[in-house]
Amino acid sequence: FINFVKYDGACEEGTSYWGHAAGKLYDYLQILSDGTGGKISLFQEPMIRRMGEYMSRSYVGNGWVVNFADASAQGGGDPLLIYRFGKAVNSEEMMHFAAYLLNGRKPYATMGNDAFRSLQSLLCCNDLAKATPKHEMPDVTWYPETEFCYMKNKHGMFVAAKGGFNNESHNHNDAGTFSLYLNTIPVLIDAGVGTYTKQTFGKDRYKIWTMQSDYHNLPMINGISQKFGQDYKATNTVCNEKNRFFSTDI
């Protein structure tokens, strides 16, 4: 999995799949570290930390998150999992964010179908309860390999834009799309995905309107919509973090 995902740490599938992707990787790395008494640990690797902090960076506010591809538009993730991940990679950002997601509630570990994750969550409830709730992130977050860019300003504007290509994980034909939020309220939205059916993962996936470029914040050029495939991609995608500038050629 580490060799499959991009080194920049972004999750193409979005925050709603993060718990099954980077979150599950964290579980396995924790088992590996615990089983070897810390002798084998990857938590110091910058890539692993970036994979964790993707959750706090993708959180717009008031429950809304960046939702490219099949991702849900709401849901910040499991606070206990985010806290444990943050503690392992020494990310104050993640630990504060986990407390922020609780919104004043007491941490509560549910006994789900993942015994390891449930037991680990039980062990950190008290620590999370003591953490300072805070959601702080840089004004610009740029994932150069995945080509995701998040920018915000002091006036409450948050822009999420992407380059990419049309054969990503849980792909939509959406190379070059963007979403805009004002004071955490979605203004220019990504419609996301409907209820999964057999068609969603079959040969007729791109007959579903939510998968088509026409229903993203993208132009139809000369009556032609974007097509599915590795070769249909954005090019010359750049982000100037200092000047808060993002550009991509579709």
Language model feature labels by segment:
Residues 158-240:
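Catalytic core of carbohydrate-active enzymes
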Residues 166, 245-250:
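Acidic, contiguous internal or C-terminal segments within carbohydrate-active enzymes
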Residues 20-188, 239-241:
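Carbohydrate-active enzyme catalytic cores, enriched for enzymes
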Residues 5, 33-36, 223, 227:
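Alpha-helix capping/termination and helix-coil
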Residues 1-14, 27, 126-133:
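Active-site lining segments of carbohydrate-active enzymes
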Residues 9, 146-147, 192:
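Glycine-centered flexibility sites
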